[in-house]
């Protein structure tokens, strides 16, 4: 568990650290003070692209991750959207992709619990969410390590399945 004020200050520190700006997969980083979250636009990994072609027979355009705070669980909450590349009558476009087996596609079966949600404070848009119910057990919430809670959370909930490589 991380108190909201601590989350807010650690989110700013995380953004300022440039960890996402320097990530090879990251195309764009946007800190949203109004909605109290961090939006990332990512290039799909080769493995994710291969899984998508094999499972869904589709080509990926990009991935969106949104880091926000769950006031119900008092934990960070990771939201995810996957966009596919399409061509209709020769006109390229991107379309939101809603795979039926998201865990297999992301190769996170048994590691995280994902669900499809409508997020009201994000214009009622549809996102997959990594359920935060076991977060404190996974990340560890001892008081002496609270100052690094969000960094540890990011390494587990994002970098563990997407990998991290400097650009």
From Swiss-Prot:
The question of whether Ion transport is a record keyword is answered with no
One example GO MF annotation? Atg12 transferase activity
InterPro entries xrefs: Atg10, Atg3/Atg10
In short, the EC number is: 2.3.2.-
In this protein, the active site sits at 133 (glycyl thioester intermediate)
What's an example GO cellular component term for this entry?
phagophore assembly site membrane
Keyword Membrane tagged: yes
* Listed GO biological process terms: autophagy; protein transport
Q: What is its main location?
A: membrane
Matches recorded under Gene3D superfamilies:
3.30.1460.50
Report membrane topology.
Answer: Peripheral membrane protein
Question: Any idea where this protein resides?
Answer: Preautophagosomal structure membrane
**Function text:** E2-like enzyme required for the cytoplasm to vacuole transport (Cvt), autophagy and nucleophagy. Acts as an E2-like enzyme that catalyzes the conjugation of ATG12 to ATG5. ATG12 conjugation to ATG5 is required for proper localization of ATG8 to the preautophagosomal structure (PAS). Likely serves as an ATG5-recognition molecule.
Q: How does it assemble?
A: Forms homooligomers. Interacts with ATG7 and ATG12.
Family, as annotated: Belongs to the ATG10 family.
Protein name as catalogued: Ubiquitin-like-conjugating enzyme ATG10
Q: What are the top taxonomic ranks of the organism? A: Eukaryota, Fungi, Dikarya, Ascomycota, Saccharomycotina
